[in-house]
Amino acid sequence: MRKAILALAGTLLVSLTAAACGGSGSASATQPTGGGATTAPATTPLPVDAKPFPIDPSEFTTEIDNPYWPMKPGSQWVFRETDAEGSVSRVVVTVLDKTKMIANGVEARIVHDQVTQGGQVAEDTYDWYAQDADGNLWYLGEDTTEYENGKPKTKEGSWEAGVDGALPGIIMPASPQVGMTYREEYYKGHAEDGASIISTDALAKVPYGRFENGVQTRNFSAIEPDVIEEKIYAQGVGVVLEITVSGGSDRDELLSYSEG
């Protein structure tokens, strides 16, 4: 899965409430205050690592209304992605009015994620998501293609839950709490990502606006253990800011959002 706040001393900053105030500006964030954040109980059931986790396909829906990443068909997010060398890419994420039956029996919503550089497609991905009866947002796989000079180069990173041992994961819990740690995706040797929630009162300023009371995650991968990313999800919008805080300095910031 493709991932990418401004880092201060290698740490994202966070603060306090959940609305977007219009306007533009540079991407930034502020340090956890400690007040307002709740701690996850040890019994919270979420999938971790490569451990089996029972799911019932009949309890899933493609009508995704998780407050921290609602996916109504037609919704679109546009990001500016800047890498360590200063190269800028445009990322457009669109929720399609299409679904896919995943190999593990779950019907998933298809989300198109396209990265362009200098007007040329650099990466083209179809991600698959579904929501369970409790409101947890699940990630069930992706069909991704990287391009070089306008031609397909590799499909490395593609996977589907239920195929060749691949397992689905959580992208956003129904009731996110500080301390929750969960698997986002698992396909041994290809996609082994996880996340921990480190704040529920994060503040983010991006070109699209100012967001308070965001959920902030720390994202990691067993395949690239030196790379750590952090993300902020705003209520009613989804991801608004992503940055690599260790092993790189990539940054994604939300430029625009339109609800379907």
Task: List the predicted regions and their residue ranges.
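C-terminal motif of bacterial Sec signal peptides marking the signal peptidase cleavage site
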Residues: L16-A20
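Bacterial N-terminal signal peptides that target proteins for export
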Residues: M1-A9
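Conserved functional acidic sites
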Residues: G22-A27, P32-G260
